[in-house]
A protein has these predicted regions:
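Non-catalytic cap/lid and distal C-terminal segments of serine-dependent acyl enzymes
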Residues: 19-305
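Bacterial Sec-dependent N-terminal signal peptides
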Residues: 1-23
C-alpha cells in the first residue's frame, strides 16, 4: 500500500510540474526546481531545448536572467514575456544562428536588486549614498558576486555535465534586461574566460532605482560604474557586447548614461563587429519591447556565418 501511495504522490508531482511549465511555440522546457546551491538562495532553472534536440550534437548555451519572464505570458506576474522560445525557435529553423539551448535563471523577487546590482560598484560608493542604496534598493546585503559565482561554478558545470554543450567561452553567453543587463556585463567583466559575449537590453545604466535617482546619487553611482568598466572590460574585440535602449517609460532616462558608456567602448578600441549600441524609437522598459527586438542581439551573439 505504501508503495502505491508513494507512486501516486510521485505521479501527482510530475503532473503538477508539467501543468506549471510554460506553453511554448517551439521546443521544450526541462525545469529544475530550487536548484541546489551554496552561494545564493535556491531558485528554479528552466532549460529550453530546441525542436529536434539531439543528444549526439553539441550546443552553445545562453544564460538568461529573470527566467520566469522568458517564455509564457500567462505564467508571469505582469502577463507579458520575452517569447524567447519563439525568437530562438524561428532563428534556428531558418538556420541563422548556432544550435543552442537557453538556461533561464529565475529571479527571487525580493533579492533581485541584491543579486543583480554589481557588487564592486556598491563597495566603491561613499556614504551616505551607499547606505541609502543598501537600505532602500538592495534591502540588505549585496549578493551579486555570489550570484555570478553561482552561475560560473555551480550552474554551468551542472549544465555542461548533464546536457551536450560546447562549454568553451566562445559558445557561452548571457542575456538580460534592465538590472539583468547590468549583471550580464558585470559577469563578463568578472569572468572573461567563461563568457564569449553578453546582450544588455535596456541596461539600467543609472544603477540606482528610479525612485532614488537624484543629482548626487546619479552622478556618483553611474560614475563609479563607468570607472569599473574602464578598468575591467575585456580586451577590445575579444568578446561580443551588445547594449540597447528605447525612449519611453524607464528607458527615457538612459540616453545620456549610455552615451558615456559608448565613449568608453570607443576609447577601449571596440569596433562595430563585436560591439553594438542600438536605440529603438518608441520602445519602452517592458517585456513587450524586449520580445519585439530580441532577435537582433541573438543574431549578433550567435550568428551562423
Amino acid at each position: 500500500m505504501k508503495k502505491y501511495l508513494s507512486l501516486i504522490i510521485t505521479l501527482s508531482s510530475l503532473i503538477c510540474g508539467a501543468q506549471n511549465l510554460p506553453a511554448l511555440a517551439f521546443g521544450s522546457i526541462e525545469r529544475i526546481e530550487n536548484f541546489d546551491t551554496d552561494l545564493v538562495e535556491p531558485r528554479n532553472i528552466d532549460i529550453w531545448l530546441p525542436e529536434n534536440f539531439d543528444k549526439t550534437k553539441n550546443y552553445s548555451v545562453v544564460y538568461m536572467h529573470d527566467g520566469q519572464m522568458l517564455f509564457d505570458s500567462s505564467k508571469t506576474w505582469n502577463k507579458t514575456s520575452w517569447d524567447a522560445d519563439d525568437t530562438f525557435g524561428k532563428l534556428l529553423k531558418d538556420g541563422k544562428i548556432k544550435d543552442c539551448i537557453i538556461v533561464g535563471i529565475w529571479n527571487i523577487p525580493e533579492k533581485r536588486y541584491a543579486d543583480y546590482f554589481p557588487q564592486r560598484i556598491i563597495d566603491s560608493i561613499t556614504e551616505p549614498t551607499k547606505s541609502k542604496i543598501l537600505k532602500l534598493q538592495i534591502n540588505g546585503e549585496p549578493s551579486a558576486d555570489n550570484y555570478v559565482k553561482f552561475i560560473v561554478t555551480e550552474l554551468k558545470p551542472f549544465i555542461d555535465k548533464n546536457y551536450p554543450t560546447k562549454p568553451e567561452a566562445e559558445n557561452t553567453f548571457m542575456i538580460g534586461s534592465s538590472m539583468g543587463g547590468l549583471i550580464s556585463i558585470y559577469g563578463l567583466c568578472e569572468y572573461p574566460n567563461t563568457f564569449g559575449g553578453v546582450a544588455c537590453l535596456s541596461i539600467h545604466s543609472p544603477l540606482a532605482s528610479f525612485e532614488l535617482i537624484d543629482e548626487n546619487t546619479d552622478n556618483e553611482v553611474s560614475s563609479k560604474f563607468r570607472d569599473y568598466l574602464e578598468r575591467n572590460l575585456p580586451e577590445a574585440n575579444t568578446k561580443k557586447i551588445y547594449f540597447d535602449y528605447g525612449n519611453l517609460t524607464g528607458d527615457s532616462f538612459y540616453k545620456p548614461y549610455q552615451s558615456k558608456i559608448d565613449k568608453i567602448m570607443v576609447s577601449k578600441g571596440y569596433s562595430s563587429t563585436l560591439w553594438q549600441t542600438l536605440f529603438f524609437e518608441g520602445e519602452s522598459h517592458t517585456e513587450i519591447s524586449w520580445a519585439k527586438r530580441l532577435s537582433i542581439p541573438v543574431l549578433f551573439l550567435l550568428n551562423n556565418d
